[in-house]
Swiss-Prot record:
Record EC number: 2.7.4.22
Predominant location category: cytoplasm
Name under which the protein is recorded: Uridylate kinase
InterPro entries hit by this protein: AceGlu_kinase-like_sf (IPR036393), Asp/Glu/Uridylate_kinase (IPR001048), Uridylate_kinase (IPR011817), Uridylate_kinase_bac (IPR015963)
Gene that encodes the chain: pyrH
Kinase among keywords: yes
Amino acid sequence: MAYARVLLKLSGEALMGDQSYGIDPAIVQSIAEDVAKVVAKGTQLAIVVGGGNIFRGLKGSAAGMDRATADYVGMLATVMNAITLQDGLERAGVATRVQTAIEMQEVAEPYIRRRAIRHLEKGRVVVFGGGCGNPFFTTDTTASLRAAEINADVVFKATKVDGVYDRDPKRFPDAKRYDSLTFQQVLSGELAVMDSTAIALCKDNNIPIVVFDLFEPGNIGKAVAGEAIGSRISNAT
């Protein structure tokens, strides 16, 4: 395997499937089975999951909610997703722990960096919920932060598109997909990959990002093996 320790970022929307809201159990199980295959080969894997399938803080703020309050509601939504993923992973035979940045010890461990790393070393998957515990930060930024903290080799952003484009491929059929590009290109071009804080964290800590289509069967395994799928972002192309 090309990567020994991976941070997988899943959007909340990815868990919806074809629904407009909520969680599709079939999608959760499909993701869990793909992860199980990777873990069985010895890769250490942690997951950060978003909450946009249940609540998105920015939308709440735009509707008049206090921004910090809306972000806290969004953080709680990510915990719901994290526990759901844990259930799916355990049914797929993968030992899993959920750690949350906001303590709720009846359902999850508090986030403790050294404990998270120890879980990974023991072959368990760790799902991080609750964002980074502070409002005004996205779950993409949380993914970059946790990747740096656990010394991950790479961040996988598994999404609904097959890579990074120079413009929206849904609106522009002639949009160009990048096979590889630099962090500086993403920041300078304001490309819609992750927010600038998330990109800067990976740039400063020299953690590459691979963006790929989550719904292409076997893509998580291909990405872990270092196959050329999606778009790779790093300090050098």
